[in-house]
């Protein structure tokens, strides 16, 4: 099939590349000419395992193209994906200005029947809005469908190529058939294509992400209670998650959720609920717990060292909001580091992939180390903020020698309290008093 994907951000770039990988001819459209030139030369602006290699191979095999000519790209395509950003507005709602701008341009470019796909995460009712905008610009037939993405950063390529389900919101049999044909090669293992009405598909993305956010906040709430009553949060987690009705995913205590999806989608769903006369108390509480969780971690540090940290330097391991990505949007590290800086602390930080991203957030306010062990030199404590694999089994003897005092604040519950305390460390984690 001939496809255009409008927007070369995280979602658009992964979707376009993976669709090309299955033999489709894909044009990725963006108005940033410098970015497009870099992509043509195999320079990828985001870190996502396997993506760079796949872009290079599909570009060289003439299946994947990058263009700033939206009109020509739409004219050549049967399916047009809208994958532009929907940034959070001041009131928590999703800002649809880019979606609406693209819809208007698509309408002007349509020359025959097209399937227009909302791939961006958008509020319920957006497809109707897009349809009305396009109708004003063209007399040609078209259908607008919703096809939300469920990609995990750090595993996005695998998630797209081997999805556990594909959700298609469509009110048109013609569009549904085309979308089923498009996704057939991705679902040879028998995982389902779930066909539903457009509004239900739009709601599904928000419902799924908000549920996962609630699970994370629930795990953190339980861990905080465990600390107060003297229970072991890890043992409680294991006992609870052994129940098949509950399962183990997204129930690990830590520093809360971050990234480009969960925080934004939770707030957007709350806004949608409130705007339609519904209370979203459970979801609102998850958001509050998430914000508080980072500050509780800072409180652990100040409880030990005192409120004045002007003579303290901390090593930070991990800046990205999760492993296997360089994304720092809504990362716990931002809140925690800024809070420590305000109290006078100095920071020496290291992350395997997010160092350049961190410079955008912190500039020269912190020191950037070249390795995890360099970050430890002459610091008063180690703060583990992201659970990268290379931090899971470090050389603790080396850590002890490099730190001025052998203290670890583990925000991801990666290490064994028993073994570290036996080795002479002072150890703080989440959910253990």
Residue spans for each PLM region:
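Structural/interface elements that position substrates and couple domains in central-metabolism enzymes
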Residues: 1-433
């Amino acid at each position: 099939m001939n496809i255009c994907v409008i927007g070369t951000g995280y979602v658009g770039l992964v979707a376009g590349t993976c669709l090309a990988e299955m033999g489709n001819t894909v044009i990725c459209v963006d108005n940033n000419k410098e970015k497009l030139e870099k992509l043509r030369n195999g320079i990828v602006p985001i870190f996502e395992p396997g993506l760079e290699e796949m872009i290079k191979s599909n570009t060289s095999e003439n299946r994947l193209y990058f263009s700033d000519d939206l009109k020509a790209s739409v004219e050549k395509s049967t399916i047009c994906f809208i994958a532009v950003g929907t940034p959070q507005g001041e009131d928590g709602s999703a800002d649809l200005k880019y979606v609406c701008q693209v819809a208007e341009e698509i309408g002007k470019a349509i020359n025959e029947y097209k399937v227009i796909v909302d791939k961006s995460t958008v509020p319920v009712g957006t497809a109707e809005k897009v349809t009305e905008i396009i109708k004003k610009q063209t007399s040609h037939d078209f259908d607008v469908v919703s096809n939300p993405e469920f990609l995990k950063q750090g595993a996005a390529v695998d998630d797209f190529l081997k999805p556990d389900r594909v959700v298609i919101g469509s009110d048109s049999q013609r569009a549904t058939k085309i979308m089923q044909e498009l996704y057939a090669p991705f679902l040879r293992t028998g995982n389902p294509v779930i066909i539903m009405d457009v509004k239900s598909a739009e709601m599904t993305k928000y419902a799924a992400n908000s549920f996962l956010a609630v699970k994370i906040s629930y795990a953190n709430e339980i861990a905080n209670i465990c600390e107060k009553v003297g229970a072991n949060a890890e043992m409680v987690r294991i006992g609870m998650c052994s129940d098949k009705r509950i399962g183990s995913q997204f129930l690990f205590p830590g520093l809360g959720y971050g990234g480009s999806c969960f925080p934004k989608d939770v707030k957007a769903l709350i806004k949608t609920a409130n705007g339609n006369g519904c209370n979203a108390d459970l979801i609102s509480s998850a958001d509050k717990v998430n914000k508080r969780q980072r500050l509780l971690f800072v409180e652990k540090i100040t409880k030990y060292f005192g409120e004045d940290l002007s003579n303290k330097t901390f090593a930070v391991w991990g800046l990205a909001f999760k492993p296997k990505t360089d994304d720092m949007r809504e990362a716990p590290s931002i809140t925690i580091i800024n809070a420590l800086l305000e109290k006078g602390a100095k920071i020496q930080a290291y992350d395997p992939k997010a160092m350049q991203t961190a410079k955008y957030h912190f500039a020269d306010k912190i020191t950037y180390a070249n390795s995890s062990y360099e970050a430890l030199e002459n610091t008063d404590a180690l703060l583990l903020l992201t659970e990268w694999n290379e931090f899971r089994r470090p050389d603790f003897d080396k850590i002890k020698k490099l730190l001025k005092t052998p203290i670890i604040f583990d925000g991801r519950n990666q290490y064994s309290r028993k073994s570290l305390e036996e080795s002479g460390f002072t150890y703080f984690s989440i959910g253990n008093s």
